[in-house]
Every structure is written in C-alpha cells, then in structure tokens.
Amino acid sequence: MKPITSSSKRRWNRFRREMCNYSKRLDTFQKKKWPRAKPTPETLATVGFYYNPISESNSEERLDNVTCYMCTKSFYDWEDDDDPLKEHITHSPSCPWAYILSSKNNPNQNPQAAALTKCREQTFVDKVWPYTNRPDYHCEPSVMAASGFVYNPTADAKDAAHCLYCDINLHDWEPDDDPYTEHKRRRADCVFFTWKDPNSLSPTKLSFLSTSNIDPEDLTEDNSILPVSPTRDSTKSHKTLNFSPSRKNNLNARPLTMSLYTNTSEEKDSQPTRAPQSPTKPVLLTAPRRKNKSPKKSKPAVFKPVKPIFSDEDEDDDDLTASQPFSKGICNDSMQVAKKNFTEEIPLKEDEKDNELEHLVSPATSVHTTVSDITGHQSVTDESDEQNNCMSTPPKIEIESKIEEEISVVSKSKEISSSVSSVGKEQNHTEKQVAIETPEQQKVEKEDEHLNLQGSFIEESTKQPISSKPSTSSPDMTDAATGGRVSSSSFRDKILQTNFSPRSTIDSFSNISKKRNSEEANDENDETNLKIPIPEKKRKFQEVLQSKNILVSSTEDSHEPVKVTEDSQTAIHVSKFEDLENKSMESEQSLQLLSESENDDKPLIDLIPLLAIKRKDNLVSGVLEKGKSTSTSKTKFDTSIVDFIEKPKTEISEVLPEEKRKAICDESQTVRVSIDRGVTKTRDVSSPVSDEKSENVNHEEANSGHTVMNVHSSLDPQPIVQPNELESGSYLKDLPDRNVGNSEKVTFQEDDINSPKLQSKNNQTVEAVNTETSDKLQEKEANHELENIEKIEEKLTEVDKVSLSDAFPDQEIKNSRTSVQNGTRSVSKNTPEKETKVDKIDNVSKKDVETSPGSCETSSAFAKTYAEKEVTSINLPSVRKPLDESYYDHSISPFDPLCQSSFLAPQTPVKSKHALPLVEANAPPWEPIDFSSLLESPVPNPVEPNKLSEKELDMTVEQWIKFMYAKCAKEFEEACEEKIEWLLEEGKRAEEYIQNL
C-alpha cells in the first residue's frame, strides 16, 4: 500500500458531503468493480474510504486507489495482509475519523477525553448536520460530541447520530431532546458512561496511602538505601520506604537536635564506622552517590544552643570563648556562673545581675584600658592587677554597649572642655579617667605611626585632666599662664605611656558611672562658656590672629595635621570680616586722596569706573594674600561699591568718549529717552530688546548737545498726530506721567513742532487728502453704476432668448438684442435716478409674431401674453440699489432656472428647432396608479356590537381577537389578489401596445 499526500484539503463540495454516508461510500465500490479481494469494500468504507480509481494515459494507472472523505488522503497498491485502519492512522494521524476508530479498541483511552470530543465534533460537518445553527434545538455539534455521538447519516435519516461504543443510532431529534440523557436512558451500560482506568488503584489502596502520607508515585520507584538517623541504633532493622528525590533531599536537610555538651565517647561507641569529629561540628549524613554524577558541595551545618529571647548574650559568644584563651587570674566561680546561665537557659533579672557582679568584683580595683587592646595590639599587663583582679569575661554585648555609652559621654565633655577651658585649671581628681576613641576618630588620627596614640590615659604630676585627642592641636587651646599657643611637640612630651591590662573589667565601668554626676555638672558650665557673644570672642582670638610667626613655627614642628574645631572656624570668619572692613576703609581713603590731589582737573564721572575697578583689584589681591577664598569676600564688597558709587544721570557733558558713555549707560538702570518727531518714548535699559536696538546711534545729534543718545527704536508704532492736536498740545497730556529731565525740557523748547510753517504744511496735506478721497469715491460710484447696467442688459437678453425662442424657433433674435443694448446705452448716459422703459421690444415682438410660420396656436398665444407682461413690467432700477434684490417677479415666469443658470450667456446660440412632443395624441389613456396603498395594512370596518353573530357572542375575548385577526388577514389577502390581477391585466395591455408600435 502506498499513500498519496494531498496537496491541500479540498472544500466540502456536494460529492464530499455525500461521502459522509456509509452507504454512499459503499456504492462507489459497486459502481466500478473493486479489483482486489482483500481488503474488502465493507472494511474500507467503515474506515472512511471511498473508491477513487485513477486511469489516465499520462499518469500511472491506480485502479485500487481509495480516498478518505475526512482527511482527503489517497492510498493505493493494497496488499492482502494490509490493515486499512492501521495504515490510515499511521500515514494520516491527524484524521479525526481514524483517531476515533482507533481509540474505540483501546481500553486505556478515556471516551470522554477532550481530544476525542474534539474529533467527534469535527464529524458533524457544517451544512450537512441540520441542527448546526438552530438555537431552538439542543443538538449542536459540541453537545452531540460531548454525549458520545458521531455523525453517521443514512439514506432514510439525515440527522442520524451513532455511538461507536454501544452501536446505537438516534435520529429525528426534537427541540426538547437532550442528547446526553437520551443516550444514557437507552444504553446506561455503555462504555462511554461506565469506563474506568485499569491502572487506577482500588479505594482501599487509596485510603491506605492517604493515611500513611506516602505519594502514590513513590511506590513505583525502586527501593534505595536510606541514611540511618543518629537517634536510632544502627543495629536495629527498620522498614525502608522509597521516597521521591525531593523527599530525600528534605530528609537530609532536616536539622538534628544535638546538645552542645554531649560526650564524644558515646558517639564513638554508637558510630564505630564513622571518623571521629569535634563536638561542635555535626554529623553529616549524605545519600549514596549515583554513578556518573559529581558529588554536590554541601556546607556543614553549625548547630547552636537555643537561647532565651530576652538574653543580653551575643550569638558569637561561643566562638569567642573557644578561640580566646582565658587570663591567669580568672577564678572558677565565674566559669560556674557562666556555665550555669548557658545550661539553664533562663534570663537573669537586673537585680540578680548587679548582685552577682558585686559579689565577683571588689570595689577598690581600678583598670587602665587602651584602644590598642580593642584593636588587637598586645600590651604588657601589671602583675598587681592580675593578682588583685579575679573575674570572668562578661558577655560581649554588655561590654560593647557600655563602651559606646561612655565614649559618647566622654567625647562630648572633652570636646567642650578642650575648646573653652585652659590647661592651667587645677582639678584634684583622685580617680583616673578612661578615654576611648571611636573608629571614626582613629581613622583621622592614624598618621603618627611611631607612637600609636589612638587613645590613652594622660597623667600629669599635678593630676590635671587633658583633652582625649592628643593628635589634634586645636587653635583655641592656649596656656593660661603664658597666653601663648600649645604646640604639638610640647603637648607630646606631656603624654604618659602606661601599661594596661588586656581586658576591661567591670570596675572601670563602675567608676565611670560614679563620675557621671560630676562630669554632667562640668558640661553645663562648659555650655555656658560657649554662649559668649561674638565681640568677646573677637577680643579672645585677637592675639592668636596677630601672632602669625608663632602659628607657623608651631605648625612646622608638628608633623600631624591641624584639626580645626568650631571655635577656630568662627575665629577665622571674624578675622576675614575685620580684614575686609580694614581694606574697605583703606580703599575709600585712597579714593578720596586720588580724587582730591591727582585728578582735580578731570571730571568726577570719568574717575568713578576707574576707581571702582582699582578698588575691586585691591580687595581681591588683599584676600588672595591672606590665602582665603574670594567667593565670600566678593559678595560682601559688591554691595558696598554699589552704595558709595553715585548712579550717573542723563545730564552728561559732551566731553565723554563714546565707549565710556556706553559703559555708564549699561551699568546704570536709567531711562533712555528717544525723541522722534515730537513723540516721547520711555524704555528700560535692562530689557534685552532695548539693548539690541540701542546700537544704532546718531553721533551728529549727540555732538549737537540736544540729547544724550538719540536711539531709533522700531518697537512700537508711532501714533499719528493731527494738526489740531499739535496746536493744542493735548497729545502730551495723553502720554503716561513721568519725570521729565532738564535735557528733555530743552529739547521740547527747541523743537519746531509748534512752528507756524509746520502747521501750514499739515493743513495743506489734509486738504489734498480730502480732494483725493472725494475723487476716488466718485470713480467708485461710476464704476458701480456701469456694472449694474451691464448685469441688467445680460438678464434682459436672457429673457428675450427664452421667450422668443419658444415662440419663434426658426428665427434668430438679433434685432431685439441690439435694440435692448441701444436702449440701455441711452439709459446709462442719462442720470441714474430716472426710470425708463424699453419700447422697442414691443415692436420687435409684434413683427416676429406676424411672420412666424408653422407654430402651434397654444404656444404662440402663451408667448404673446407672457412677452407683453414681461416687457411692460420691466423697470430699470437706480444705480445705487443693491444687486442682491430682484427687480422683477420670478414667480410669474416659468423659466426661473433658465434665467438664473450660467449656461445661457448673451452671445450663446439658441436652438432653432422645436422639441418633439414626448407622447402622441393617439396614446392610450393610462390611469395613475398609487402603489403605496399596497404597503398599507387595510383598516377593518368598525364592527358594531349590535351586529355580532352568534358565534362571536359565544367566543371568549381571546378567541374573538384571534377571529378578528384572521378575518382582517383574509380581507387583506383578497384585496391584494384583486390588485395583482389588475396589474397583470395592465401589463398585458402594455405588452400588446409595445408590440403594435
């Protein structure tokens, strides 16, 4: 057997729709004899094939070719052992019919599967199944397929549906039929309803699996060796269940509950095969390794004891205790207390903690700590401290919290005391102070690597407290006795390097807590010292700013960077302010000297910009010499310059050159005045438009001394000044009020606006304009009259053409046109107010009527009457009458569209022949038919209640309404039939008439 791939699926034509029927497919094998014994025609027809032989001379002879009606695929060269269904589904797996038949014999295939339902739905071919688009029926293709039916029509029943599982055929479907219920009611034992999966488990197995919490998929997998749990003995035998890989991973990932204080010997005894491990590391259980797979890297889990929620202990205390060795002088009592806290796992109250700490630590002990101990630097311990002190390591979180608190308190107090208090103050402190710096301060002060002085205790012979910042030499720290600045070298000599114990004890913190009250009192005094007004600070730091050499020497000696505090910054700002004031005073004095002594001859206006520039240079140079920023100083002296420099006025002498005059005008925010033809305009120099327009300058007028600068601006249109306004001067009153300068007053006095010559010229121009406008108006009126006359002529000629062409079609109307033109010309020569009538048209029309041959009497009579009425009623209107108004009555003339059309111009030729009549005199008298009456429903005659028949009286209301509707419908049908018969008769008459023509 060989298949033929179809090029494309053919459409469902009529022949293909017939092949849906099994009997039709079987008939194709009988019409043309099937050449083979096997496979039989019956089997081929059931599979969906119909006989389609190919016997053409050009191609091969395929006498055993068959084609599927559903997928249109052809097969030929059949053999005896071929199975048609198997060949069909193998070579055309997408065929719905083959898929349905193959699934019928498969017990593992669910009949109600979605794929089978879709294939069954495709068998109900459109335009073949009669209930496709019938909403009143419940037999749509999707519903039939979901009920288990396929379409299998027969010769007797075209709506037959067939079930392949129970071989039932149902046809003659009604609107109320439900296919699913009908199928189940007739064949309840059909496989479509009773199918069960043979591979499914029984209910007892499912219930067992649900109670045992085992996945059904896990039972099908092979058993594997599971890791032994550490709590159970390895000698015992356990039942092993095979879990899925995900469950294996979850089991291996479970944390094992192990105690921190377990005995390692017991573990070794219980697990002899495993390598010995440390007690802190857990025992790792791994699954057996599979072949050809690399082992995954698993991180060992670290198990920690469970701690109370409200404990002050840190998570890493175990690591610290294990890694850091204890010092020699630690007692066993502290270890017992610490172990007790870990084992009992109960948080201690605050009172209990204080009691234990007082019991452990003696009150007379004192501890010296350094930052080098915190950062990891080893220091030599004092033997006396080791012998006296005996305590355990407190929890780390308590140490850090207390250290941070004390650092914040000490750093604040020491910063305030170092900025205000002097070194010479004597305070008798019997106790030593702790000074520990934060990591941020350590980063700033790490430059001196030789000393490693990140934080230390400072002890003098007199036991005076010194600042906790040894590396920073602040400028405000001065010696009270000498009044000079303490250099870093001298300060370095005072530092005492002491040996401290490696660990900070609670004694230090107890001493610090006792001293808080005294330090807070000192802090309040320091804050009051900080609230000193600025004038006192000026006096305080005046000596520091004057002694430059001392500052330089002190900074050169110290290799460490100078740290500037807030008070030092305020001192620098005060010094800047004083320098600027001194410089400004000096510059003012220099300006006065220059203006009085050197430049007495020159005017003041020339000297102002030069002195301002010099003053700026002096101030900038003075600030740069100090080595300070010029940004702040510029903002200060700019305002002072603006104050003492006088703004230039408009009254400037002619001696100034052009460049200086422009500079002065740009700097000063003054009003520039431009006087053009006696019209004043004000402008602001700061606007960008005025700056662009101010470039065009008349140097001649500037030298003449009338104005400062005559700027020609074309921004605003200049108002036209009438001569009467010039005389009265009212145009000046209408302008906006402003202060007029002396120069402007001079210009108004010297201007020639109010001179008698200019007034006479303006009067002459006004008279000339009046004469010109009057001439133009006269010309316009004359042109308007001529246009009106021409339009009237055109309309008259159109009327003549239409009327006379209908009356006398054989002659041209030239005389009438010329006569009308002559008449209109004579009218145009006369005055426009007179009204004239055209009398020559009467003569022309009378002559033409007498000589008209072969014209109808009706048309000639109509033309006479119309021409007389039209000509006598024409009155030429006056020239000043608008053209939009009609000058004759259009309703009288039947030729309104012709008169107003643009096709009949005065010189266009007119038809000479008369049009033939559309209908001859012998035409049959057609009756007018109104077809709209057929569409209207007939109105029944009102029935009187007295004339009701006996039948109607016996009826109910509903029956009587139905009876009346039927009666009206019958009458309407009769009326329609009568009209149809009449139309048919008239149609026959029309046909006979046309044939006779």
UniProtKB/Swiss-Prot annotation:
Cellular localisation: Nucleus; Cytoplasm, Cytoskeleton, Spindle; Chromosome, Centromere
- Keyword Transport tagged: no
Cite the binding residues for Zn(2+): 163, 166, 183, 190
What are the Polar residues biased-composition ranges? 240-252, 370-392, 463-476, 485-512, 756-772, 817-830
One GO-annotated biological process of the protein: regulation of cell cycle
> What are the GO MF terms of this UniProt record?
metal ion binding
**Pfam family, any one:** BIR
Question: Where are this protein's BIR repeats?
Answer: 25-99, 120-194
- Which keywords does UniProt give here? Cell cycle, Cell division, Centromere, Chromosome, Cytoplasm, Cytoskeleton, Metal-binding, Mitosis, Nucleus, Phosphoprotein, Repeat, Zinc
**Compositional bias of kind Low complexity:** 408-423
Q: Name one GO cellular component term.
A: mitotic spindle midzone
What results from changing residue 990 to T? In cut17-275; temperature-sensitive
Q: What is the superkingdom listed in this entry's lineage? A: Eukaryota
InterPro entries found in the cross-reference section: Baculoviral_IAP, BIR_rpt
| Signal peptide range | none
- Grouped into one coarse class, the protein's main location is nucleus
Region Disordered: list its residue ranges.
217-329, 370-527, 682-701, 755-782, 817-838
Entry comment on modification after translation: Phosphorylated by ark1.
* Keyword Phosphoprotein in annotation: yes
**Basic and acidic residues composition bias: which ranges?**
426-451, 773-782
Q: How does it assemble?
A: Component of the CPC complex at least composed of ark1, bir1 and pic1. Interacts with the mitotic checkpoint complex (MCC) subunit mad3.
Q: What does this protein do?
A: Component of the chromosomal passenger complex (CPC), a complex that acts as a key regulator of chromosome segregation and cytokinesis. Has a role in chromosome segregation by recruiting condensin and ark1 kinase to appropriate sites as the cell progresses through mitosis. Ark1 activity depends upon bir1 function and phosphorylation. Ark1 with bir1 function is required for full-scale association with kinetochores and formation of a complex with mad3.
State what protein this is by name.
Chromosomal passenger complex protein bir1
Species this chain originates from: Schizosaccharomyces pombe (strain 972 / ATCC 24843) (Fission yeast)
Q: What is the lineage of its organism?
A: Eukaryota, Fungi, Dikarya, Ascomycota, Taphrinomycotina
